[in-house]
């Protein structure tokens, strides 16, 4: 073996980190970045710079490179592709050896792949489009505490999507009035109600009182309906210690499900809470507050499909996933792609949906996608078509805004859902025949009839900002 020599100075990244003939290993973590390089920086150099800064490199040669096998540990940019319809950017595919990352640590993966490299001057903008986690790494992560099938068995609910509702107004209610709103929704036919993501423990409603009144409402609704009910008690807190304190109290009250804001609260806290839920048999609902700050810019940040993969590794039984048809951002094909990423055991590369790699989850349980944001009964046929049964459809204003009150709003949604599921099971194309299906069901449900009249003119027809690159052609 020849002796290594140290040559001080600065050299182009491509000489070390650009390897177009690299043979990708089954154990490599693969990343696809969309890069807009600075003027004068060519594609190979920009891609190699990203590989270097997100793995072993720095701005100059250092003598301590000789103390390790740099060729083994470095990231490698192995392929470059054009972005359809965008001449300013390109895709760079980078392979990282699995030993660069701590086992079971989403925090460590994000620190490397989305750390200092995103402020690197060699690139004008940078976006992490997708990541392939090898099964060898997936197996080191805990994943969802319970999973889709276990949740079905806990709740004894099968053959349809769950129905939920975020209590409104999101802020300002007293704990007792909050509990009253929960009870009305649950007795009307919903499966779940939810704390809004910014409901923590404010002066108008401290967390302990909220938990008490909500659980009283749940138990009362369960006795009256004979169904299991739940409310996503938000345990997100200023510190991990306080978060676990709230989770323990929810357990004392026999709450079936709790909630965490996983991006604002952080992946370290989220993984710890997921482990706690797994040990204690409690479902974990995950809200994605702050995601659009990170994923909405089509040229810089992290695509939501990556955030969804990170959540599945970190742990959560539900995750907000957009609606396609509601008030929030979400391209239809891209949304269908990350819904599959959340639920399925194996997902094949599919550029038409923005999926850049095959992803094998092995036996890791799936995550229930949650559709929430500006939806109402008229959206039900599309939602059932898009999301299927293993989903939770959450109607906040679409429940609480009913002219006859919360219980009537809940009943309208339940009738609409069951009518669509029954029609689908008969082979009816429900998205095409949705109006007829709902109109027929409304003949036997005055609550649904009023809901349809109330929201018949409500649409959110704004164009999607973050379009799939294939749609740019």
Curated annotation (Swiss-Prot):
It comes from the Bacteria. Its EC number is 4.1.1.39. This is Ribulose bisphosphate carboxylase large chain. NCBIfam families: PRK04208.1 (NF003252). The lineage of its organism: Bacteria, Pseudomonadati, Pseudomonadota, Betaproteobacteria, Nitrosomonadales. Keywords: Calvin cycle, Carbon dioxide fixation, Lyase, Magnesium, Metal-binding, Monooxygenase, Oxidoreductase. Binds 1 Mg(2+) ion per subunit. GO terms for biological process: reductive pentose-phosphate cycle. The basic functional RuBisCO is composed of a large chain homodimer in a 'head-to-tail' conformation. In form I RuBisCO this homodimer is arranged in a barrel-like tetramer with the small subunits forming a tetrameric 'cap' on each end of the 'barrel'. The record marks 327 as: Transition state stabilizer. The active site is at 168 (proton acceptor), 287 (proton acceptor). It catalyses: 2 (2R)-3-phosphoglycerate + 2 H(+) = D-ribulose 1,5-bisphosphate + CO2 + H2O; D-ribulose 1,5-bisphosphate + O2 = 2-phosphoglycolate + (2R)-3-phosphoglycerate + 2 H(+). Heterohexadecamer of 8 large chains and 8 small chains. RuBisCO catalyzes two reactions: the carboxylation of D-ribulose 1,5-bisphosphate, the primary event in carbon dioxide fixation, as well as the oxidative fragmentation of the pentose substrate. Both reactions occur simultaneously and in competition at the same active site. One of its GO terms (molecular function) is magnesium ion binding. Substrate binds at residues 116, 166, 170, 288, 320, 372. The modification N6-carboxylysine is found at residue 194. The keyword Oxidoreductase applies. Its cofactor is Mg(2+). The keyword Membrane does not apply. It is an enzyme of class 4 (lyase). Belongs to the RuBisCO large chain family. Type I subfamily. Mg(2+) binds at residues 194, 196-197. Pfam families: RuBisCO_large, RuBisCO_large_N.
